[in-house]
Amino acid sequence: MVQFNEIYTEYENTKDVCKFCEIYKENSTATRFLLIRSLDKPSLTEIVEQYSAEDTSGNMKILTEKAFHSSVTIQQLVEYIEKKRTELIAQREEELNGLQNILNDFPIVNCGVRNDKVDDIIKPFVRNKSLKSFDTLIDELDNSVLPRIRQYCLWSYYNQTSNDIIELFFLKHPTVLPTLRKIHDIDFFIKVDEQILPFDLKFTHISDSYFDLASQGIIRNMDISHHDDFYIENDNNENEMQKIKSFYKNFKKKNRNLNLPNLKGLKKNDLCDLLASSGDPEAIAFINKMKDNHSSYVPSTSEELHSLEWWNYKYQGERLFCNNNRLFIFLAFKHKFVDGRELKGKTFEIGNKIKDMLGNITNNGMHTVKYFYDKEASLEGNYTALSLSAIYAE
């Protein structure tokens, strides 16, 4: 019999939820534990009252242990959580009432802060020894620091509110079993083919880095000696960014009279806008060709989505690394060289994509993603996870 402290400690410390589920798969122990771990305190109290001879005293960990040692079954846990669904939906709908109207009125905003570190804006300001008068200090604060913090606050609101509205589509779907409290690296469970599988929800735009690799060719790996599902066809070829830079550099040299700025600090969209503003037929033809190519890199088939899912696992940052089952919602512009984060406010359209995906879900429809991770020595190794995704692109 699995000891509670063993399984509890293993889960709290793991960066590989899939491995955890594999270790404790016998008698569906992992599933039962995770369902119990996902209950809030009032729910744990009710479970202990109904299915255990123990009293209901103690903190969250003690109540979780008492519920774990009770007679409650997976089916009874599922039925209990299902009874809470209507209450949760009503609560979320009341909280979110009218907020879509605010999103509709939002200006286009960028985050403006890397890794949510607002202090990175404030530190240079407070350490700036060139501000020699109070007036110049206030001018720097009002015109440089505060606009960036305001932008970050607006983006954070837009991002969080969009998340909350879109998550309601999952809460309402009968295939999805919600968690009743936060549980690390699991947002909900999916019921499929008599299984209950934990999933983490990932909203993300398709990264520039993915488009660069896709432009070099992402190919299915048929060599079973390598764990990665895909590989890059030719990483010596110029990628999307390099092609745009090369054309811009040559165009700038041939058209010195235009006084085009140097490459440093310019992004794909900046370079294309500068080329387009020249009105040169060759430059415009090049941009149109690059946009057509860019559109072809936006996944439209299950196989293409599989490669995008693989990329997001393989190249995830080491700071927040986790190997867990994931349900991705990807956002992208087909003919613009900007990320698709502003599309997140299109909650109705994204909701329809979610309904279509969940309405046709089967075990066979999920992707088994295999990847080798080597961005951090302590995490290096072969990993396997289940993945699902939907994409909204314009």
Region roles according to the model:
Residues 180, 189-201:
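Active-site beta-strand-loop-beta-strand hairpin of nuclease catalytic cores
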